Amino acid sequence: MSNPLDRHLEWLNQHTEEIIDAERPIIDPHHHLWPGESQYLLEDLWDDTSSGHNIKHTVFIECTQEFLTSGPDHLKPVGETIFVKKIADEAKKEPSKSQISGIVSHADMTLGEGINEVLDLHFQYGESLFKGIRHAGGWDPHENMRNSHHSPPKDMYLSDVFNQSLKILGEKDLVFEAWQYHHQINQVAEIADRNEDLTITVSYTHLTLPTI
């Protein structure tokens, strides 16, 4: 069975862009790793990072892969950290190639104080690579629009329990990665105002609404 990503590669390969400033060291701050049918793993990543630019390091961003299949639901996202850490360790065998130097994992930010247990396990298995949490908040009221992959409720970012979790991230010097639709960007600004000591990265500033 062919990889479904092949059709995307065919499209990309129609045009080759000029390499600009090829010697400048770059950190790629956002990529995924996909096992299974739509496979995109270390060798695929290296094919991209070695295509002309000087990409020294990358940061993996959660994509709900390889969750634990047993145990409490709130701890299952730790499986993705375990999965990526193994690949990052494998990459160290080829130090001349791009290294996965950060992992932004998932945890349910509506856990409040309960998030500490999840973060502790991410630290345990991700070690120094574990850098933060993404909990996607993309929500729209229209029935024919698809909400983001964590199935958030309306105004999740503004809830008291979510902001309790944000404060815990800040105390642990972890990053929060926000993922929202264009009409929710003011909510990101509001949580930034509430959490001045927290580093927030924004996955998408004006993400368009996907239809079902």
Protein language model annotation of sequence segments:
Residues 1-96:
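An N-terminally biased module of ancient metal coordination in phosphate/nucleic-acid-related enzymes
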Residues 2-11, 72-184, 190:
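Active-site gating/metal-coordination segments in enzymes
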Residues 15-20, 42-52, 114-129, 186-196:
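Short amphipathic alpha-helices and their capping/turn segments at secondary-structure boundaries
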Residues 24-25, 53-56, 98-101, 128, ...:
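A structural micro-motif
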Residues 64-68, 139-140, 207:
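A short, flexible beta-alpha/helix-coil linker loop
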Residues 196-199, 210:
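Short, proline-centered helix/strand-breaking motifs
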Residues 200-204:
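Short acidic/histidine-rich active-site segments
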Residues 205-211:
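Conserved small/polar residues in nucleotide/adenosyl-binding loops
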